[in-house]
Amino acid sequence: MNDKQRWYTLSSTANTFNGANLNIVWDKENTYWSKLASTSSYPYPKLNDSKYCNELGNLNKLDICQDLYWSADGTSLVAINDDYGIRQYLIPESENCDNESMLVPFTRTFSPRSIIASALSPTYSLFNENRSGNMLLISGRDVPLQSYQLDTDSTSCSKPSMTYNTLNDKIERYDIIFSMIFINSSQFITGSVNNKISLYDVRRKEPVVSFDRFKREQSSSKRKSIISCFIDRANIDCNNRYPNIVYFGTYGREMGVVDKRMASQRRLLNFQHGNGVYQILPSFNGHFLYILHRSSNTIDIVDVRKDNKVINQLRIPYKIGTQKMKGTLSETNGLMLGTDYGSVINWQSDMIEFGGLASDGSIVKDYQQSVSECLTSFTGSRINIVQQCPQGNEYFAISYSPDKFSDSDKTSAVKSGISLLRASID
């Protein structure tokens, strides 16, 4: 690799989520919270308990962060965990790399059931005077889609603020929402089975429009007809470039596009590798889409200006398995993706903004020449989420864990958690 960069840990959950017993995790978290609350002049709201905290069985499992979000102002994080937990973290003010601080939940609440997918409003901040902008959407099985208001007290997420109709009249059951994303602060879009996509207004229970024309076009397909993801819209410039269209991926190895003006969707690509698209990252200039697949070691690069054709590929130095490894892309830092051995690989911005090509337009085939590596202190763990702070190019939040689908990794010795890191060139 061209160069190696050291990322320094500023704050982390330390050993809170280590091991494979949820009761032990919750007890450690309560202890850390009590120590923090007793030494702080600020009245920290009491952490809520899971309704399963008194159960003796079925709690021997990993507690991995499945979704991680920055607030718009970069002052807090929201984490969705496998223990059905919804946690808000305030970012510590100290930036001393030699004195790592403890990342303790500011609020902790629990969904009564497992969370399949989530989406956070782009206007979220713990410091919002108007809490209506702090909307979190969560989906589950056999329940309608629900939204919650994230607040600064122990009542945060105690009950839904809105319930949205996802009932499938044909089978008299609720559609399972596998993916969703806010288009803006007042609209969001959802994806479910049979390649069904629905557009909602946050203030209305019924969808503005639902359509599955894509499903009928592909009715002969034997692969899973599930909308697996939508284009990552954390990039503000991307929102300006795509105000009315939304790209999406499926577990059937396809990519398509929705045009909310015409209430239509169409298939653009059918990939020949991997086991389903799970993330679509746009370049900052809006010209390219970076497509990540399960069970693959390749990132496809799609040029939206050339009939949405794959014009290049980036090779990953390991094979992504069933557990998703979510990356981040920015104008300053390019494309960053965690590895299964505790580092972060980085394709520089000047290459990413030109479709992964060299300055002379040629395709760089040698992996060693096209990527650098960022070293962390989490050697041996999988860094399954990398999120850049929206207010600081050198700050990152990550989730690290063992392989959740490997039985050998479900022991008391495994390490999981969330960490706040700062990049610095050696």
Swiss-Prot record:
Principal location: nucleus
N-terminal signal peptide: none
Compartments in which it is found: Nucleus
Keywords, in A-Z order: mRNA processing, mRNA splicing, Nucleus
Domain of life: Eukaryota
Subunit structure, as described in the record: Associates with snRNPs.
Protein name: Protein SWT21
